[in-house]
Amino acid sequence: MDKRHDPSRRIIAPHGTQLQCKSWLTEAAMRMLMNNLHPDVAERPEDLVVYGGIGRAARDWQSYDKIIEVLKRLEDDQTLLVQSGKPVGVFTTHSNAPRVIIANSNLVPHWANWEHFNELDKKGLAMYGQMTAGSWIYIGSQGIVQGTYETFVAMAKQHFNGSSAGKWILTGGLGGMGGAQPLAGTMAGYSVLTCEVDETRIDFRMRTGYVDKKATSLDQALAMIYAANQSGKPVSVGLLANAADVFTELVTRGIVPDVVTDQTSAHDPLNGYLPQGWSLEYAAKMRKTDEAAVVKAAKQSMAVQVRAMLALQAAGAATTDYGNNIRQMAFEEGVTNAFDFPGFVPAYVRPLFCEGIGPFRWVALSGDPEDIYKTDAKVKELIPDNPQLHNWLDMARERIAFQGLPARICWVGLKDRARLALAFNEMVKNGELSAPIVIGRDHLDSGSVASPNRETEAMLDGSDAVSDWPLMNALLNTASGATWVSLHHGGGVGMGFSQHSGVVIVADGTDEAAVRLGRVLWNDPATGVMRHADAGYDIAKNCAKEQGLDLPMLGA
């Protein structure tokens, strides 16, 4: 019997102001863990899988139940330790310490590979936490919509003279991460064709407003794309097909999309990528009987897809890796030029990271959408001179359906995170918001990750693989008074390829919270500016000087 599978479970986080825990700090952790498993949020909630292949919120259902039980009794001077999704200890700390400290999927480097992890996973000794799955701050596909939108806007500026009109994007994958691309693309003015092998995922994205139409053949999908481009009204199409097949067929036909990328779960060849010619049912059977054959077939198909991406790039498509490590997988299968197209971070996002700008997010614990709309207005009030940000907030309200507890993603940096958080805390204090707000971010942020094939690819000083930075980030956030802190391995790009940390803090309207918010939400993005200044980026050096950061070696 699989202790991780229970189809009878239907988890919905409590709404309103009635507490089940002893404080809003522990109530927030409980609600956010539960929200990660909401049926409109998680990919396979019955298996505790939130997104990204096998990214889980808890190791098994027994561990989940025990975490909830402990959070309900946890005192204001206690800290719960969670080891790869399993609650292992409660210790006396102090009121400004984190209420929860989480470590997920961490392995000694020599053993940091999928083969060793999968053995531990089968024995019930480990859990893959992805990034925000095991750190309890996933908010559905909205979590990466703005970053994806900003990337596609940057691509239009860089490749199409600033206009995406009549342009279309080819991509793959409609899981928790890939599901953001169709909506982000149409918001940025492109039509989007996304290949997906699991029809239930296409239907889910259509139900939640991320995909407009479904197609069952390439010809049908292309007809939808061409009609939309002629009408001037972008459309997103979910095509029920294998990405490797479709990408290759387009090369054969000589059809060149304007933008080519991919967000299948290529980081996990065993669980995340369906080989060409395989059905979902056959793959599920083979995972139980011959894991090595699954991995080999998946990586061979990834090699086919990457060769097609390279061919489309050579034919003129703006081509980028969107952070799923597909280039690495193809390289290991003999595609020696797999890295000839860039990752999206060095190509389009790094200047933002240099100023500590990244995916800041917050959640209304009340469950009331009005609390989010009021915070949207507060963001506009406090950042009046950023029309692109205002445009994002307007589009988000109009086009993004909340999944689970109402939430908002908003890319802001060192200059703004702390003051926004303090304003939200004041809104809770004066009753403008009906309940406290949870504030967090993706682990994909400026100072919280080491990932040489994604966030830290092609660093100016060659420090791509140095992972001291996310470790220091987690330690500093713990010392600064975050509500819960997490340290993970393997998120986004798979085992052996990344280390990263997460932070969440509660704005409960108290003066004590204000002090913690001011520290955490200054220090956290400041580590990103520090990391990039240390690597030699002038934008980061200037930001550090302007904001008065004390970096002893700056200018040395």
From Swiss-Prot:
It is an enzyme of class 4 (lyase). It comes from the Bacteria. Binds 1 NAD(+) per subunit. The active site is at residue 410. Its cofactor is NAD(+). It holds the Pfam family Urocanase_N. It catalyses: 4-imidazolone-5-propanoate = trans-urocanate + H2O. Pathway: Amino-acid degradation; L-histidine degradation into L-glutamate; N-formimidoyl-L-glutamate from L-histidine: step 2/3. Its EC number is 4.2.1.49. GO terms for molecular function: urocanate hydratase activity. Disulfide bonds: none annotated. Keywords: Cytoplasm, Histidine metabolism, Lyase, NAD. It is found in: Cytoplasm. GO terms for cellular component: cytoplasm. Gene3D superfamilies: Urocanase like domains (3.40.50.10730), Urocanase superfamily (3.40.1770.10). NAD(+) binds at residues 52-53, 130, 176-178, 196, 201, 242-243, 263-267, 273-274, 322, 492. One of its GO terms (biological process) is L-histidine catabolic process to glutamate and formamide. Its main location: cytoplasm. Catalyzes the conversion of urocanate to 4-imidazolone-5-propionate. Belongs to the urocanase family. This is Urocanate hydratase. It comes from Shewanella frigidimarina (strain NCIMB 400).
